[in-house]
């Protein structure tokens, strides 16, 4: 599994568990309320949208082939303890759908950050964090820029800080895209 391989290469394998299961069948493989944090980067394109990759795995990674955001949030709500954190990477054009789904599953949005490739480009991602069975109140973080300019050759100081923070002593993180 790619996530476990990357975690091991970056010295993080002991810090999390990874479940390989159908999100719609999560109740059969886990116990309700057994996780402190659930992180998801779910598929966000409708089946009839965008480039249709011939590789079924790659197609499923980007397209809602079996479950939409509501299925992923429902799975997270099942997995999380009260007070547990839900973290999602999603597309900005579907932000309202994500927030509505979180609220409807008793996961209160707590932090939101919009990610831009650079200052002259429209947003490409949203990072949302919620807390199960929490009180209302959300912080909107300042925008995050991946690149320092529109050439997209140099990371921003914020992106460099992310690499430094999570490098665990290595000079840079390893991303195994095999």
PLM features: what roles do these ranges have?
Residues 2-36:
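S-adenosyl-L-methionine
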Residues 65-123, 127-128:
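Conserved Class I SAM-dependent methyltransferase catalytic core
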Residues 1-4, 8, 45, 99, ...:
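Class I S-adenosyl-L-methionine
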Residues 28, 49-50, 98-99:
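Short glycine-/acidic-enriched loop or helix-start segments at secondary-structure transitions
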């Amino acid at each position: 599994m790619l996530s476990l391989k990357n975690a091991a290469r970056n010295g993080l394998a002991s810090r999390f568990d990874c479940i390989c299961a159908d999100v719609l069948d999560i109740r059969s493989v886990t116990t309700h309320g057994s996780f402190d944090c659930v992180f998801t980067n779910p598929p966000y394109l409708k089946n009839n949208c965008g480039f249709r990759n011939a590789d079924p795995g790659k197609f499923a990674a980007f397209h809602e082939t079996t479950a939409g955001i509501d299925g992923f949030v429902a799975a997270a709500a099942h997995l999380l303890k009260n007070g547990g954190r839900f973290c999602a990477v999603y597309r900005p054009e579907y932000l309202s759908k994500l927030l509505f789904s979180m609220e409807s599953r008793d996961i209160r949005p707590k932090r939101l950050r919009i990610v831009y490739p650079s200052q002259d480009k429209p947003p490409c991602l949203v990072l949302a964090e919620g807390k199960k069975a929490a009180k209302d109140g959300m912080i909107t973080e300042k925008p995050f820029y991946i690149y320092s300019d529109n050439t997209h050759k140099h990371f921003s100081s914020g992106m460099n800080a992310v690499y430094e923070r999570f490098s665990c002593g290595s000079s840079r993180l390893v991303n195994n895209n095999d």
